[in-house]
């Protein structure tokens, strides 16, 4: 069995309780899946929290600015797209040799696509869908059946089935009342807890409900849920897998704000709970179209250029501003100058970047109260179809892909969510003559970080077999392990106040990243929203930033951006 590894210490995202077997599931038809975003999408702008779904920006009429963005993840690229649309000049610097950050992927020496994690697109990802439509990537999404599937030990399947023509909130009520993942008593107590939540207010007053949800940041979801009559069994069998999938931590450790933010959208928007996945790898089908849009608009990517130091000074009035950023690529070193600097990093990345003196400002110091969660992503390629449990003969043939085509949750393994990418993202992951490609996310990843690849792969292989006993006898042909030391920030109780605004006390320095202040959780959607917010701050400060450029010219002419030493001349284009 071949295997590969990638270690990344920080990245620059029935009734009556009786379970049923797979005969309740609809098998996938590999090439007949809806993909357009023009269908099966709720209008998120109607009766929705404005913080989550901001209106389109007004046309910018201020001075053109030269912007340097550190980080080519979703947050950085979202910022770049918004600024380029408003006529600014943008350069993006990325220390890796590929873009995408936590949603990045690359091809190894054997031609396998390696991802940083399992990427699922909830129907409430309005800002990300907006970006994808803008860059022409909307047709790259495959719509899955509108059901959330739980795979329990022994191959028992539980569901939250949202397939009801009446829509929200009735489809959600039906899903929770008829789920076979919980026993009747737990379902009843679950219904009581949700009925006593801000989710109900969201039906008539979404902004008020959003404020109520923010106010619950200082309590864990478990404490909130149990206080409202929910049961520990509901947490263990349903909500923990969901919490792990969303934030990589369990309900005892995740803020009630995070879970209830999602619940409020599921309750009010029919398609918010509808899942999509990319038709293939993120680098090809997500980052690729965004990169093309940026370069077509005149933006520039500079890969393998890392920021070593932020250089700054003070004006006569005491205002701090950046004079340049010291960049390096292998043994090459350059000084990059711009009108505006955006740090689109993750939590460990921004901690390394901020000058220690800036911690005198609470906005920067508070970042050090945030920590990332370790996560391990494992890929296992089989010589048959792991999730096909009804027909043993079909699971052994390699002429056509069969099995469960969706995101899958489980409460009975160290990986909370997983998918067979050969089914769910077939363009790059279905290989003729081979079988399932199980991609599983180990959360929390702490116990796995020090383990060697072979030990991790063997543990995951055994747990997959526990979930799918019918896969006994299938062999693992190939595997990969990706370790990320700090991924999403740990969204524990009381951490939301420490998330920084995109606008900082440093006049020409802005932040982007899913950890920054925005009403969604740390996620692809959160990263995209943070980029929109950062760009909005920059455009609203356009006149002031142009005035700062003039003042620097008057007070420190040696710090000017001159045509002979501009960024595009200093760095090779990619």
From Swiss-Prot:
Coiled coil: none annotated. It catalyses: 9,9'-di-cis-zeta-carotene + 2 a quinone = 7,7',9,9'-tetra-cis-lycopene + 2 a quinol. Pathway: Carotenoid biosynthesis; lycopene biosynthesis. Its cofactor is NAD(+); NADP(+); FAD. Its main location: plastid. Keywords: Carotenoid biosynthesis, Chloroplast, Chromoplast, FAD, Flavoprotein, NAD, Oxidoreductase, Plastid, Transit peptide. It is found in: Plastid, Chloroplast; Plastid, Chromoplast. InterPro entries: Amino_oxidase, FAD/NAD-bd_sf, Zeta_caro_desat, Zeta_carotene_desat/Oxidored. SUPFAM superfamilies: FAD/NAD(P)-binding domain. One of its GO terms (cellular component) is chromoplast. One of its GO terms (molecular function) is 9,9'-di-cis-zeta-carotene desaturase activity. Pfam families: Amino_oxidase (PF01593). One of its GO terms (biological process) is carotenoid biosynthetic process. Its EC number is 1.3.5.6. Catalyzes the conversion of zeta-carotene to lycopene via the intermediary of neurosporene. Belongs to the zeta carotene desaturase family. PANTHER family: PROTOPORPHYRINOGEN OXIDASE (PTHR42923), ZETA-CAROTENE DESATURASE, CHLOROPLASTIC_CHROMOPLASTIC (PTHR42923:SF41). This is Zeta-carotene desaturase, chloroplastic/chromoplastic. The lineage of its organism: Eukaryota, Viridiplantae, Streptophyta, Embryophyta, Tracheophyta.
């Amino acid at each position: 069995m071949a295997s590969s590894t990638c270690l990344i210490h920080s990245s620059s995202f029935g009734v009556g309780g009786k379970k049923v077997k797979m005969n309740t599931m609809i098998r996938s038809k590999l090439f007949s899946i809806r993909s357009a975003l023009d269908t099966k999408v709720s209008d998120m702008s109607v009766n929705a929290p404005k913080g989550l779904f901001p209106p389109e920006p007004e046309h910018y009429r201020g001075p053109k600015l030269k912007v340097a963005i550190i980080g080519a993840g979703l947050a950085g690229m979202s910022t770049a797209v918004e600024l380029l649309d408003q006529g600014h000049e943008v350069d993006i610097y990325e220390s890796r040799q590929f873009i995408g950050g936590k949603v990045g992927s690359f091809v190894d020496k054997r031609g396998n696509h390696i991802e940083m994690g399992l990427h699922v697109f909830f129907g409430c990802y309005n800002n990300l869908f907006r970006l994808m439509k803008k860059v022409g990537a909307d047709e790259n999404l495959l719509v899955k059946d509108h059901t959330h599937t739980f795979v329990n030990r022994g191959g028992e399947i539980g569901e939250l089935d949202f397939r009801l023509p009446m829509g929200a909130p009735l489809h959600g009520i039906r899903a929770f009342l008829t789920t076979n993942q919980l026993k009747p008593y737990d379902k009843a107590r679950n219904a009581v807890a949700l009925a006593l939540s801000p989710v109900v207010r969201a039906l008539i007053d979404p902004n008020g409900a959003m404020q109520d949800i923010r106010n619950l940041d200082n309590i864990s979801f478990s404490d909130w849920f149990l206080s409202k009559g929910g049961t520990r069994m509901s947490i263990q069998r349903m909500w923990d897998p969901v919490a792990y999938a969303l934030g990589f931590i369990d309900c005892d450790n995740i803020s009630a704000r995070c879970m209830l933010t999602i619940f409020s959208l599921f309750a009010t928007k029919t398609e918010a709970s509808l899942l999509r996945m990319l038709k293939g790898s993120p680098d090809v089908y997500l980052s690729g179209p965004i990169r093309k849009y940026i370069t077509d608009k005149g933006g520039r990517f500079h890969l393998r250029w890392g920021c070593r130091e932020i250089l700054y000074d003070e004006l006569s009035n005491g205002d701090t501003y950046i004079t340049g950023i010291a960049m390096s690529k292998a043994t090459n070193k350059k000084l990059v100058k711009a009108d505006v600097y955006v740090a689109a990093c993750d939590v460990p990345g921004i901690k390394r970047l901020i000058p220690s003196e800036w911690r005198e400002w609470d906005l920067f110091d508070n970042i050090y109260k945030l920590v990332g969660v370790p996560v391990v992503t494992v890929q296992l390629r089989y010589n048959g179809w792991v999730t096909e449990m009804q027909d043993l003969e079909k699971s052994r043939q390699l002429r056509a892909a069969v099995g469960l085509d969706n995101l899958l949750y489980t409460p009975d393994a160290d990986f909370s969510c997983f998918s067979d990418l050969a089914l769910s993202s077939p363009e790059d992951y279905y290989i003729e003559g081979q079988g399932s490609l199980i991609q599983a996310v180990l959360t929390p990843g702490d116990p796995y970080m020090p383990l060697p690849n072979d030990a991790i792969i063997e543990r995951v292989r055994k747990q997959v077999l526990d979930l799918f006993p019918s896969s006994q006898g299938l062999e693992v042909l190939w595997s990969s392990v990706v370790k990320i030391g700090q991924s999403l920030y740990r969204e524990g109780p009381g951490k939301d106040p420490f998330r920084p605004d995109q606008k900082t006390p440093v006049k020409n320095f802005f932040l982007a990243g899913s950890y920054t202040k925005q009403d969604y959780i740390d996620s692809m959607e959160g990263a995209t929203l943070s980029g929109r917010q950062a760009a909005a701050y920059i455009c609203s400060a356009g006149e002031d930033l142009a005035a700062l450029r003039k003042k620097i010219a008057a007070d420190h002419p040696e710090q000017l951006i001159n045509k002979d030493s501009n960024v595009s001349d200093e760095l090779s284009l990619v």
